[in-house]
Amino acid sequence: MTDQPRRRLVLASQSPARLNLLRQAGLDPEVIVSGFDEDRLSAPTPAELALALAEAKASVVAAKPEVQGALVIGCDSVLDLDGEALGKPADAEEATARWKAMRGRAGTLQTGHCIYDTASKRYASATASTVVRFGEPTDEEIAAYVASGEPLHVAGAFTLDGRSAPFIEGIDGDHGNVIGISLPTVRRLLGELGVGITQLWTPREK
C-alpha cells in the first residue's frame, strides 16, 4: 500500500509567530495573506469577533484559484479586557494607554481558528481562550517597551515571545494560543475535516 500524498497547507496570515509555531510542530505551510479589512466586521463579543475574522480570512484565501485542493488555515487574535475587543493598537499613544490599563490585571486572549478544505468545500472553526495575567511595569518600562515598536504589531499590544514577556506574570491555558495559534485546536479542527495532523508533517531531515 502506498502512502497518500501530503496535503498542501496554506496559512492565511502574515504572522511570523504563527508560521514559526506551525513549523516547530512539523508543518510547513505556504503563506498567502488574505488582505481582508478587519474593520469591516463587528461582533457582540471579543470571542465571536476573533472567530468571524478567522473565518473571513480563511474564506478569502480559500476562494483563490491557486489554492484549490489545499487546506487553508485562518487565525485572528484579540484581547478581551472587560468585554472590549483589543486588537493591534493604532499608535504609540494607544499602546501606552492600554498597558497602563492592563497592568496588574488579567485579560483573556481570544484566538479564532478556521480551517477550510478547498477540496471538499467544508470548513471547521473554533475559538481558543487563554487567560493572561499582567504584571505591573513602571511608566518608564511601558514607555521603553512602546518605543521599541513591538506592541504596535501584535494583538493586545503584547506578546509572550518578545520584549513584553517580563511584564506577564503567567497564563492559564495554551501558551501557543497567546502567541497566535493553538496547535491542539488546529489538530481538533483538522480531525473534524477527516485529516490527521500527522499526515501533514514534513519529512524529518536525517
Curated annotation (Swiss-Prot):
An annotated GO cellular component: cytoplasm
Cofactor list: a divalent metal cation
Active site (record annotation): 76
EC id: 3.6.1.9
Catalyzed reaction equations: a ribonucleoside 5'-triphosphate + H2O = a ribonucleoside 5'-phosphate + diphosphate + H(+); a 2'-deoxyribonucleoside 5'-triphosphate + H2O = a 2'-deoxyribonucleoside 5'-phosphate + diphosphate + H(+)
InterPro entries referenced in this protein's UniProt entry, alphabetically: ITPase-like_fam, Maf-like
Cysteine disulfide partners in this protein: none
Any one GO BP annotation for this protein: nucleotide metabolic process
Subcellular location: Cytoplasm
Described function: Nucleoside triphosphate pyrophosphatase. May have a dual role in cell division arrest and in preventing the incorporation of modified nucleotides into cellular nucleic acids.
Protein name: Nucleoside triphosphate pyrophosphatase
